[in-house]
Amino acid sequence: IPRYKLQMVRTQRERGFRTYALSNINDVVFPFVRDVLFTQEGLQLDDYFEKAYLSYEMHELKPSPEIYRKMIEKSGMRPEATLFIDDNAENLHTAQELGFHVYMPRPREDFRFLFDDGPGR
């Protein structure tokens, strides 16, 4: 995970935005992601996200609407006030059907401009 993306998420959280992850991940890969990829800055996953919703814990996979509904219910988020970012069009289609604002970054795209944090703002 590029450091600027980790910092982008952390900056939004510091600004008072609620940040969540919804991931189709399994229990074998998750420890590596949590303990290696998210600790580059000496921080933990919880420093970036209020909560990580993980498919293997929720027993659902994106793009099933049910995993989104469970996340909405558990978090209290309002889809109409939430930006959902994903690199899979099917996942975004479901999110949009449920009322989320959506964005699909291009491969290697620096999308900090969405948050006025970087190049292209």
What are these language model-derived features?
Residues 23:
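Conserved phosphate-coupling serine/threonine residues in phosphotransfer and NTP-handling enzymes
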Residues 1-20, 65, 108:
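Short, acidic loop-to-helix structural element flanking the phosphoryl-transfer center
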Residues 26-27, 33-121:
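Asp-based, Mg2+/Mn2+-dependent phosphohydrolase catalytic module
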